[in-house]
Amino acid sequence: MTVLHSVDFFPSGNASVAIEPRLPQADFPEHHHDFHEIVIVEHGTGIHVFNGQPYTITGGTVCFVRDHDRHLYEHTDNLCLTNVLYRSPDRFQFLAGLNQLLPQELDGQYPSHWRVNHSVLQQVRQLVAQMEQQEGENDLPSTASREILFMQLLLLLRKSSLQENLENSASRLNLLLAWLEDHFADEVNWDAVADQFSLSLRTLHRQLKQQTGLTPQRYLNRLRLMKARHLLRHSEASVTDIAYRCGFSDSNHFSTLFHREFNWSPRDIRQGRDGFLQ
């Protein structure tokens, strides 16, 4: 597995924060690093396989990656993101207690993926741009300024994450997308789902299309197919069982949609013919 080292990304040995844009981020094999990072998805779509679990990421996704986590990107489509790198929560010169603002693992579950709405994403970009402008300066005031900006970034993300901000339709759409990640195999009635998240059906269609480039049903089908592809690669379940587990009632229809999406059949993926990045 590829290991990325801080010496190749941080501007100096005493720098606590570094900014690494990926505009765009291409498919990238599984790797880990000797530093931590916050991945901020600007726009586009892709699959982020995090510690073996696939997540669909779009504009507004924020992922917190620790130094022992392994992850990869695949099936990217104009995926543009910015990585905010930091050595460790306890390696800041002027800040202490940052760990309390970061996601916490509880009972083996780590809430690695958050979502923010478009207006918050704009504020995030501004903070990141300020940090990036100061990267070449190593004096104490500049170091303190970068660390303060990093603290502001964490506070903004925490206050604006799904769990704490459901006051507008964009935030409710983000909550809906997170719900689909857990309920993709369920039979989805879009009228009922729109009501569940206090959205009109028209608003749901419009905002989801704006954020992902896909209609709701097309997004759900892609999500199901992504989950199925992951199971084909990483489980011994039959194609039929995987189809049913991922929300398809007809394995032949599943195979047709799968081939249309990936240009490979489920059997091809199972046999590794697509040259999956290891």
Swiss-Prot record:
Residue ranges for the DNA-binding region feature of this UniProt entry = 191-212, 239-262
Q: Where is the HTH araC/xylS-type domain?
A: 174-272
Q: Which UniProt keywords apply?
A: Activator, Cytoplasm, DNA-binding, Repeat, Rhamnose metabolism, Transcription, Transcription regulation
Q: Name one GO molecular function term.
A: sequence-specific DNA binding
User: Its GO biological process terms?
Assistant: positive regulation of DNA-templated transcription; rhamnose metabolic process
Where does the record place it? Cytoplasm
Gene3D superfamilies in the record: Homeodomain-like, Jelly Rolls
Residues the UniProt record annotates as site (Interaction with sigma-70): 241, 250
- CDD domains in the record, alphabetically? cupin_RhaR_RhaS-like_N (cd06977)
Q: What is its main location?
A: cytoplasm
Q: How does it assemble?
A: Binds DNA as a dimer.
Q: What does this protein do?
A: Activates expression of the rhaBAD and rhaT operons.
State the PANTHER family in the record: HTH-TYPE TRANSCRIPTIONAL ACTIVATOR RHAS, HTH-TYPE TRANSCRIPTIONAL ACTIVATOR RHAS-RELATED
The record ties this protein, via NCBIfam families, to: PRK13503.1 (NF010028)
Name by which UniProt lists this protein? HTH-type transcriptional activator RhaS
